[in-house]
Amino acid sequence: MTNALSWYVAAFVDGLVQAGVTEAVISPGSRSTPLAMAMAAHSGLHFSMHIDERSAAFFALGMVKAKQRPVALVCTSGTAAANYLPAIVEAYYSRVPLVVLTADRPHELRDVGAPQAIDQLHLYGRYAKWFVDLALPEETDPMLSYARTMAARAAAIAAGAPAGPVHVNVPLREPLVPTIDEAVWEKVRTVAETPQIMSGRATLPAENVAALYEQLAAAKRGLIVCGALDQPGFAEAVTELARTLDFPILADPLSQLRAGAHDKTYVIDSYDAILKDEAVASRLVPDVVLRFGAMPVSKPLFLWLKQHRSIRQIVVDDGGWRDPTLEAACFVRSDETVLCRQLLDIARPKQKESAWSTTWREMNDIARTVLRQHLPADEWFEGKVFTELAELLPAGATLFVGNSMPIRDADTFLFATDKPLRVLANRGANGIDGVVSSALGASLAASPLVLVIGDLSFYHDLNGLLAAKMHGLQATIVLMNNNGGGIFSFLPQARHEGPFETLFGTPTDLTFAHAVEMYGGRYAVPHTWGEFRHHVAESLNTGGLSVIEVRTSRTENVQMHRFLWERVSQEIAKFLEQKGTEEPWN
């Protein structure tokens, strides 16, 4: 049994490494001992220990977002495995390749009342791209080949488009302590090679590219819409395509188009503020929209695309079905960057810029100027955090943005810059849970990293801070503390004053300083924007974990947002009125 266990788990772990999985997040447990010990002994694999499985899974998810390579998750049997579910749901919808390894009791101990034994078969349901319940360890050569093959298959399926989590259930009998030495690695490597997986990027046939180009070229009023998409080379390719087609790009903050050295002439970063005015939005209806990536954060954009059924929406996606408007006319199954390059190869550049694209860029300049000019100079305002961070963050930094209000403020107030910055968030299922853990996982490969997060989301994942202490991570957390769920103040529920605070505002009146210090972090509460800038700069220069709490008022925050949106609407309406009643692009 000892040889069977040692050789089998060693073959599986070595197969993972050979298939490109070189990072693992392990939570302690008895039944997972063989996997944990084999991973610890493998020279080609780096592992991070994380005690709480729920936090561990989000930590691994953040690692994958930053590294853009599959990461393995390892836990023991029972409810430990169930705690992975929220992060696996997020990984599924945000297309993050996780290789989830859950240790299990052997088949004879299932469904008979054995301790720490739950039904782990298909535990994650449709949120796992692929599931396998491994055979019990054997020391025969065919079974060692089987173990290596299953490892390679898991890694390949996780990384294949659309990427996502896979679940490998690993039943193990006692005794659980393997003997892992150099002889074991030599044995499993001589028995069989790990299958080599060759994969390419999805491309369209030339005739389909030509047909698509003719549709785009025929449009008088074209737009490109880019949601969350983090792909090397895409920014350069799509901005070149925008210039060639003379199509403005409505760029979500997670599209990676707002920051960097690429051409941003056609990048529209204030479209959310522009489209909030329905009268203005109704004058800006395009003929065609070419959409890349996930659906953007902006609700006005979503409603605009859904309401104007005359818009021909073309969704480019190499897998899955991402069209919540239910109005897409065409789906293009292609790698996004490859398609841009294919179109550029045959495109005929427009002879001159159209009034359509010029008007969009002029409106964007107006909106941006209004927002900047009317930001409060002294008072705390949550949106201003992003304009400040855009100045404070060094080139190459990563900004991780929490859900609810932070990501929406990033959409409005994170303006285009030539400084290379990477913007990440958990926008698959859009939950407020696990954000601290995800950001700290990303910080392993993306330093320096700044997380902007709300107080309820921070509270939800406080125990995720332990990772910073255990692994010596560098992260700056800007805690937007409005004492409750700030986003609900913008929703219809806010009109019901009686039950609102109890049901939706949910103030906690918590002071987080002692909790942060317990995890070895520094805590600061600035009283002025000057102090805020000082604490952020100090944290970036010092390293370690720092939490900077910005205390705001939910009521004042809503008032300032609405004031700014109204000012933008007024100035845009005035601008369009000066152009006359007929649209200049008709």
Curated annotation (Swiss-Prot):
Q: Which UniProt keywords apply?
A: Magnesium, Manganese, Menaquinone biosynthesis, Metal-binding, Thiamine pyrophosphate, Transferase
Q: Which reaction does it catalyse?
A: isochorismate + 2-oxoglutarate + H(+) = 5-enolpyruvoyl-6-hydroxy-2-succinyl-cyclohex-3-ene-1-carboxylate + CO2
- Might you give the EC number(s) for this enzyme? 2.2.1.9
Matching entries from CDD domains are given as:
TPP_PYR_MenD, TPP_SHCHC_synthase
**Cofactor(s), by name:** Mg(2+); Mn(2+); thiamine diphosphate
Associated pathway: Quinol/quinone metabolism; 1,4-dihydroxy-2-naphthoate biosynthesis; 1,4-dihydroxy-2-naphthoate from chorismate: step 2/7; Quinol/quinone metabolism; menaquinone biosynthesis
Report the cofactor remark. Answer: Binds 1 thiamine pyrophosphate per subunit.
Q: How does it assemble?
A: Homodimer.
The protein in question is named: 2-succinyl-5-enolpyruvyl-6-hydroxy-3-cyclohexene-1-carboxylate synthase
Organism annotation: Geobacillus thermodenitrificans (strain NG80-2)
Q: Which gene encodes it?
A: menD
